[in-house]
Amino acid sequence: MSLRLSSGSKRSYARPSTGSLRGASFGAANACGVAGIGSGFSCAFGSSSTGGNTGVANSCAGFTVNEGGLLSGNEKVTMQNLNDRLASYLDNVQALQEANADLEQKIKGWYEKFGPGSCRGLDHDYSRYFPIIDDLKNQIITSTTSNANAVLQIDNARLTADDFRLKYENELALHQSVEADVNGLRRVLDEITLCRTDLEIQYETLSEELTYLKKNHKEEMQALQCAAGGNVNVEMNAAPGVDLTVLLNNMRAEYEALAEQNRRDAEAWFQEKSASLQQQITEDVGATTSARNELTEMKRTLQTLEIELQSLLATKHSLECSLTETEGNYCTQLAQIQAQISALEEQLHQVRTETEGQKLEYEQLLNVKAHLEKEIETYCLLIGGDEGACKSSSYKSKDYTSGNAGNQSKDSPKAIVVKKVLEEVDQRSKILTTRLHSLEEKSQSN
């Protein structure tokens, strides 16, 4: 009889019993090999019966890798060894199940502590980060609104400064025009002053000439009066002479009238020019004073606006610095949060991977356990036959006889028993179906 159980897609087991029955004796040879956890299970049986002698030979390879040779001894010792090793294997399986349950409990506790879900279906839970993200969004919106308001105020201040700059340029042009007019009026005033000086000089000249004429006239009158006081006998044969007194009086009257007319004309012209010039000077002085006051007011307004502009620029710079710092802080916080999220996702992925690996390993162990249990059950059935019994922790074997129990006579016929086990497994070494076929053939003795 030969039996081989190993991991594969499909296995067939054959138990040919080659031997001869002679007399009442029964002989059996047993070779069994069982690999460790995760490997197959193989057994080979051969039996022969001759004469009146009964001999039993049994050899079994151990369940571990270290024992690779064949063991010899009687069947009871071999079965006891197999039972001990099977108990050790079951203890190892139970320890692995306990370790797996412990790991599952730890994984479940970790998920209960760090996130909702179960070991079979886990979802990302970022609900605890939502309030922080909403707060950061609100702060960003508030900062953006403040920045927009500051930019709007800066633009308004810039437009106001541009308007005042235009007004200042217009007033400066008006001031320059007024100064040019004042300079022109000053030149006119200088010309009028020169003309007045000339007129005064002419007046003085005419006054001196008049004084000189009066003095000459007085001297001539005195000379004529002195001459008239003496005895002068003049005989005139010519026509009567011209009266000099009348002539001088006429000349004096003409000169006085001419001087008076010139004086009146000069005074009238001077008064007219002085009045118009004085009126123009008064108007120009008033305009100059008004322009000077307005210029002073514009200078004061310009200084105020410059101070306000400087304060707004300083406020803008401080707001820009604050905005830059706030953006940097928020970027740093977002980067830290993103790094934490990435780390948590990586940990979650690692835990999932480990869980899947442990799940697959656990399933493989369960499949191996079921496979080994079925193989052990089949092994017990093959060893004990129809009368054999197999338990979870210990196995008892009985003598398997072909034909009648006890000693067989030499003349009994030769019997060949063939037991075939068909087992179908999938790719994960999971047993799908198991079938056991027993065939018995009889033949004549030699």
Swiss-Prot record:
Subcellular localization(s) per the UniProt record: Cytoplasm
Residue span of region Coil 2: 248-386
Region listing for Linker 12, in residue ranges: 225-247
Organism domain of life: Eukaryota
Coiled coil regions in record: none
Region feature (Tail): 387-446
Pfam families, per database record: Filament
Region (Disordered): 1-20, 394-413
Domain IF rod: 75-390
Region of interest (Linker 1), ranges: 111-132
Modified-residue entries (Phosphoserine), positions: 438
BP terms from Gene Ontology: cytoskeleton organization; epithelial cell differentiation; hair cycle; hair follicle morphogenesis; intermediate filament organization
Entry's transmembrane regions: none
GO molecular function: protein heterodimerization activity; structural molecule activity
Entry-linked PROSITE patterns: IF_ROD_2
Ranges for region Coil 1A: 75-110
Function: Essential for the proper assembly of type I and type II keratin protein complexes and formation of keratin intermediate filaments in the inner root sheath (irs). Plays a role in the cytoskeleton organization.
Note: There are two types of cytoskeletal and microfibrillar keratin: I (acidic; 40-55 kDa) and II (neutral to basic; 56-70 kDa).
Family stated for the protein in its record: Belongs to the intermediate filament family.
Complex and partners: Heterodimer of a type I and a type II keratin. Heterodimer with type II keratin KRT5 leading to the formation of keratin intermediate filament (KIF) network. Interacts with KRT6A to form filaments.
Protein name (database record): Keratin, type I cytoskeletal 25
Species assigned in the record: Rattus norvegicus (Rat)
Gene behind this protein: Krt25
